[in-house]
Amino acid sequence: MSDHQSRGQDFSLEADSELRFEIEQKDAKVLVTLVNGFAELFGTELVKKKKYEFGMGAKVAIFTYQGCVLHVTGKMDVCYISKETPMVQYVNCHAALEQFRTEAEEKDRRGPVAMVVGPTDVGKSTLCRILLNYAVRVGRRPLYADLDVGQGAIAISGNVATILIERPASVEEGFPKTAPLVYHFGHKSPSGNSVLYNAVVSKMAEVTLQSLNGNKRTKSSGIIVNTCGWVKGHGYAHLLHAARAYGACAIFVLDQERLYNELLRDVPSSVHVVLLPKSGGVVERSKELRHECRDQRIKEYFYGNARAPFYPFSFEVKFQELRLYKIGAPPLPDSCMPIGMKAEDNKTKVVAVTPTPALIHHVLALSFAESVDDDVIGTNIAGFCCVTEVDMERQVVMLLSPQPRPLPPNALLLWSELQFMDNHT
């Protein structure tokens, strides 16, 4: 590190501007301190004089409404101050949602359900985080529903999840992932099984909307829904399905006028559709980087991070004790289906999986369902494990698991196409 980097640099920001920086180098570390004034990161206020640490992959935008001075130490690949920021439009969206919440509170009704939609790499997850943080800062307790199975913000990829937000996200680590409601999908894109994806989204919406009635504060606070970046063809159909399932009253469209106009045409006139600009700090991610991000999330699930390391367990399970299934059977023409069944019914069929070496590195979901006769699709999951070895001679698989052996009684495991190479040492 150069002398200049070790001493650090002060950045003076005017009102309604933001400091943006990116860290791409492995093992790089950047420390940020708010010297004076007021600043926030994606809606979370920075504490004065406290050091915040960011590592590889961080894409940071620290915004100030009133002006501030930030002290930054470490090597950044990109760093600049921008006065062109959509934060004022974003806070206006929060203000509009607050009006809905206040009215819902007064009339004991359900609060607003707002969906954030747009193509990949326009800042959907970031806008969700901003809206959620602003909500809890004024005393709300909203639910956060993440339908993005490609880059999950709550659970690992291949699942849809919902979590109750009770406090602002940590500047460095985001929202706590405690007690999420997670439903298994098993693919990195809705295109992996469109029928199953719609079924899982419908179930999540049903359960989430019912849960709002359990707490008056959460009921009036409503739900923020994050979505996938697939917005054309079947992807657009999935967005419409989610809007209907959740009864969305507002849809925030990021950076795509075509999608905005299609939604204006296709959703009820009672739904507020708002076109918003993306932040200039949003960075397009390559296919390789997306894969790395998925891998990192799975690694953190099993091993934690430097601030809070986890120590997972490895143990063997005999083939005969392994109750492993997959949702979705190979497609058959309608003429080959039993009377009364259609080909798409196969998409939600639960079929047994025989262990083979092809299972190595696959992530498995542990379902709360006790039998395939239960509603497996409509049953949430308890956690995940990963197959690290398959011994055909001894008829055993080796599992990486957050919990020690044995698996719970009647454990029902669900296959996913997600894979994780456990190279942790």
From Swiss-Prot:
Localization: Nucleus
Pfam families recorded: Clp1, CLP1_N, CLP1_P
Keywords from the UniProt entry: ATP-binding, mRNA processing, Nucleotide-binding, Nucleus
Binding site for ATP: E18, K59, D121, V122, G123, K124, S125, T126
GO biological process: mRNA 3'-end processing; tRNA splicing, via endonucleolytic cleavage and ligation
Leader sequence segment: none
Gene Ontology cellular-component terms listed: mRNA cleavage factor complex; tRNA-intron endonuclease complex
Transmembrane segments: none
MF GO annotations: ATP binding; polynucleotide 5'-hydroxyl-kinase activity
InterPro entries: Clp1, Clp1/Grc3, Clp1_C, Clp1_C_sf, Clp1_N, Clp1_N_sf, CLP1_P, P-loop_NTPase
Coiled-coil intervals: none
Family named by the database record: Belongs to the Clp1 family. Clp1 subfamily.
Role this protein plays: Required for endonucleolytic cleavage during polyadenylation-dependent pre-mRNA 3'-end formation.
The protein's name: Protein CLP1 homolog
Protein source organism: Drosophila persimilis
